[in-house]
């Protein structure tokens, strides 16, 4: 039985265009004639079982998480130029030597916590260090430590040169999490991300509902 992911105010731009007219409440278009929909329902072949990023490695969970969270590096499936991996929350990076990588971060990113808490190098260090204590440790093979250089720059040390390390940073379970949310004792802090949608409700075995982030830092999505 297929499980449902419900995205209020739509979900992904491509999917929204492809399934326009399917499901949800009607709303009049700007010209007052043709209604459009505010809800997109997506079926998945497997049940969602865990939304704690670093304690799961399930593709069904990642369908949700890649809408609510974002990674340092963006995996390009070929639709956005020739580069296989491009900037995500990191604008650029370079190997200083075989074992040290400097990453510069976007300065306009906020967590979807309702407080517009900025995403900084402290959050990146926190996320990567935490990963080494969880089941996704293998996804960060070779990681030694991170050093915050300034608010929006971080240095990552790896054990030996590995040209695939940057690729590992595009893994959904390594999406950047809010250090402040954990420090403040927020309930289920792993649900707070930087993506265009935020967690609303999950009924296990039935559906998971996300809502659009009204003050999303990136390009406005449908």
Describe the residue ranges of each PLM region.
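Immediate post-signal peptide segment of exported/extracytoplasmic ligand-binding proteins
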Residues: 27-41, 98-99, 117, 193, ...
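Short, solvent-exposed loop/turn elements at domain surfaces
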Residues: 35-36, 48-55, 80-83, 112, ...
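Short, low-complexity disordered leader/linker segments with a strong preference
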Residues: 1-40, 53
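Surface-exposed binding/hinge segments that line
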Residues: 94, 102, 136-180, 198-203
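Short, well-ordered beta-strand elements
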Residues: 36-46, 100-104, 124-127, 154-156, ...
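N-terminal lobe/hinge region of extracytoplasmic solute-binding protein
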Residues: 43-96, 192
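Gly/Pro-rich hinge or "lid" segments in bacterial periplasmic/extracellular proteins
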Residues: 76-80, 169-222
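Aromatic- and charge-enriched surface segment that lines or borders ligand/interaction sites
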Residues: 91-135, 155
């Amino acid at each position: 039985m297929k499980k449902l992911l419900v995205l209020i105010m739509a979900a992904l731009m491509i999917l929204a265009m492809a399934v326009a007219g399917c499901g949800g409440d009607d709303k009049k278009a700007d010209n007052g004639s043709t209604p459009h929909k505010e809800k997109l329902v997506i079926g998945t072949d497997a049940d969602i079982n865990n939304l704690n990023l670093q304690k799961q490695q399930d593709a069904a969970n990642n369908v949700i998480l890649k809408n609510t969270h974002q990674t340092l590096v963006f995996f390009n499936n070929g639709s956005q130029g020739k580069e296989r991996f491009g900037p995500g929350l990191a604008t650029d990076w370079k190997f200083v030597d075989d074992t040290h990588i400097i990453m510069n971060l976007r300065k306009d990113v906020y967590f979807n916590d309702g407080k517009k808490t900025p995403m900084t190098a402290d959050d990146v260090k926190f996320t990567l260090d935490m990963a080494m204590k969880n089941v996704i440790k293998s996804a960060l093979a070779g990681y030694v430590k991170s050093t915050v250089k300034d608010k929006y720059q971080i240095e990552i040390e790896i054990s030996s040169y590995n040209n695939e390390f940057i690729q590992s940073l595009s893994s959904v379970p390594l999406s950047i999490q809010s250090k402040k949310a954990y420090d403040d004792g927020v309930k289920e802090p792993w649900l707070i991300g930087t993506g265009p949608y935020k967690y609303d409700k999950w009924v296990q075995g039935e559906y998971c509902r996300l809502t659009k982030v009204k003050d999303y830092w990136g390009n406005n999505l449908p």
